[in-house]
């Protein structure tokens, strides 16, 4: 029995579970042969994946470093402390908690620490670029709290901060949320701070989409202006899938330690925390600044070329990694566009646009992001080609010869910019 147990834990995945091994290999091939334009996705380094797939997955470590409920935590303590130190240094924060399993968990911990059921929260409408956890009725944030939503202006499709201020003065929320999932413009955190102070509200920045750009100094930082900041550690930060909470005030930050554990989670995922530490270390390197600048430059080229081809872009452009196509300009739905680009090995997602007449299951938009392909080495010239492939496919959806040409151009682009060199 002992020999059989040892054999099972030392067997390679291809031997112990060929079905899963085969599916993982198929996914690896898909990533290598498709153009990944989902704005919330990126490609981590092999070092990040090695940390996440390590023996740390075996270790339980409830509590904080040096305050655990389990023994044998001396090494995971050191790893978690390193992740915390790197997060604080990268973002200029006084306090950090690296344990949240996701961005949604990080947001929930903030609500648990600062609010009572029935309190009023104010965030951007989901259809205008907000997030489910910012008060959507299908999310716990929309069930536990009174929710007031702000949105963009119809003409500019950008935020009008005076309109946000007037809404806050009227509703007097306990918490204001800024930071979005489909807003392509720079966020004025200082203006939000002024509004929050005027109405006596806490200010939460959910910078999940722009964290990498903030870390690199390519987008203004919310740290100095907000009471608390949450983020994911993937997307533009290019780490593992997970969450992070940051504060400018260490004493205030300790509220969230208790809200994470034992308030909303049990044992932290120390293998993921190790991977977060690796990614945060990578983001502290000069190369990450160059990468983030390229992400924005590529997005602006993508938005510009798409518009040149006659397809409207929400707000007329972008300041970050996001480009949101308004397909009403060509009489197409997001659902159809998503299927069309998928047929030529381009991965994106249908998305609502401001004042969308379609349902969230159909939508009038297609959301694109440049972070993942920039990781592969795509530059402005390559993204101009990507824009043309997308436009050709959407503008002539019935033309099979155009479809075949698009598939070949995608194949050539993937060949020019290989993903992972060496075996995984």
From Swiss-Prot:
Q: One MF term from GO for this chain?
A: pyridoxal phosphate binding
Q: Which SUPFAM superfamilies match?
A: PLP-dependent transferases
Pathway noted in the entry: One-carbon metabolism; tetrahydrofolate interconversion; Amino-acid biosynthesis; glycine biosynthesis; glycine from L-serine: step 1/1
Its keywords, alphabetically, are: Amino-acid biosynthesis, Cytoplasm, One-carbon metabolism, Pyridoxal phosphate, Transferase
What Pfam families does the entry give? Answer: SHMT
Q: Where in the cell is it found?
A: Cytoplasm
What does the entry list under GO cellular component?
cytosol
- Can you tell which superkingdom this protein's organism belongs to? Bacteria
N6-(pyridoxal phosphate)lysine modification sites? Answer: 235
Catalytic activity of the protein = (6R)-5,10-methylene-5,6,7,8-tetrahydrofolate + glycine + H2O = (6S)-5,6,7,8-tetrahydrofolate + L-serine
Q: Which GO terms describe its biological process?
A: glycine biosynthetic process from serine; tetrahydrofolate interconversion
Q: Which cofactors must be present for this protein to function?
A: pyridoxal 5'-phosphate
Transmembrane segments annotated in the record for this chain: none
Q: Which InterPro entries match?
A: PyrdxlP-dep_Trfase, PyrdxlP-dep_Trfase_major, PyrdxlP-dep_Trfase_small, Ser_HO-MeTrfase, Ser_HO-MeTrfase-like, Ser_HO-MeTrfase_PLP_BS, SHMT-like_dom
Site Plays an important role in substrate specificity: list residues: 234
Major location category of this protein: cytoplasm
Q: Which HAMAP family match?
A: SHMT
Outline what the protein does.
Catalyzes the reversible interconversion of serine and glycine with tetrahydrofolate (THF) serving as the one-carbon carrier. This reaction serves as the major source of one-carbon groups required for the biosynthesis of purines, thymidylate, methionine, and other important biomolecules. Also exhibits THF-independent aldolase activity toward beta-hydroxyamino acids, producing glycine and aldehydes, via a retro-aldol mechanism.
Q: Which PANTHER family match?
A: SERINE HYDROXYMETHYLTRANSFERASE (PTHR11680), SERINE HYDROXYMETHYLTRANSFERASE 1 (PTHR11680:SF35)
Q: How does it assemble?
A: Homodimer.
Per the record, the similarity remark reads:
Belongs to the SHMT family.
Full protein name: Serine hydroxymethyltransferase
């Amino acid at each position: 029995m002992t020999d059989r147990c040892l054999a099972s834990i030392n067997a390679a995945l291809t031997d112990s579970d060929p079905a899963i091994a085969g599916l993982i290999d198929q996914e690896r091939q898909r990533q290598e042969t498709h153009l990944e334009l989902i704005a919330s996705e990126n490609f981590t380094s092999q070092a990040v994946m090695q940390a996440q797939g390590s023996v740390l997955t075996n270790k339980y470590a409830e509590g904080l470093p040096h305050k655990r409920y389990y023994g044998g935590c001396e090494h995971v303590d050191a790893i978690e402390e390193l992740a915390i130190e790197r997060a604080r240094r990268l973002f200029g924060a006084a306090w950090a908690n690296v344990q949240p399993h996701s961005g949604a968990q990080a947001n929930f911990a903030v609500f648990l620490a600062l609010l009572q059921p029935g309190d009023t929260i104010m965030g951007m409408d989901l259809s205008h670029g907000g997030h489910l956890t910012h008060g959507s009725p299908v999310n716990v944030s929309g069930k536990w709290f009174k929710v007031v939503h702000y949105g963009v202006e119809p003409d500019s499709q950008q935020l009008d901060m005076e309109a946000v201020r007037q809404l806050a003065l009227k509703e007097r929320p306990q918490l204001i949320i800024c930071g979005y999932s489909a807003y392509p413009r720079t966020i004025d955190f200082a203006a939000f701070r002024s509004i929050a102070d005027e109405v006596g509200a806490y200010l939460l920045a959910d910078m999940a989409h722009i964290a990498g750009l903030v870390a690199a100094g390519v987008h203004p930082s919310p740290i100095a202006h907000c009471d608390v900041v949450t983020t994911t550690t993937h997307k533009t930060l290019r780490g593992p899938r997970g969450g992070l909470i940051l504060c400018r005030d260490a004493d205030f930050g300790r509220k969230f330690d208790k809200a994470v554990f034992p308030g909303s989670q049990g044992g932290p995922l120390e293998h993921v925390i190790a991977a977060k530490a690796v990614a945060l270390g990578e983001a502290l390197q000069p190369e990450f600044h160059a990468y983030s600048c390229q992400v924005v430059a590529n997005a602006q080229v993508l938005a510009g070329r798409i518009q040149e081809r006659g397809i409207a872009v929400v707000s007329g452009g972008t300041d970050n990694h996001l480009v949101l196509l308004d397909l009403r300009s060509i009489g197409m739905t997001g659902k159809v566009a998503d299927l069309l680009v998928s047929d030529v090995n381009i991965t994106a997602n249908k998305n609502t646009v401001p004042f969308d007449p379609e349902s969230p299951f159909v939508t009038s938009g297609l959301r694109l992001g440049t972070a993942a392909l920039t990781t592969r080495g795509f530059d402005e010239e390559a993204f101009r080609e990507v824009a043309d492939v997308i436009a050709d496919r959407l503008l002539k959806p019935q033309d099979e010869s155009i479809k075949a040409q698009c598939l070949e151009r995608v194949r050539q682009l993937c060949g020019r910019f290989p993903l992972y060199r060496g075996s995984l």
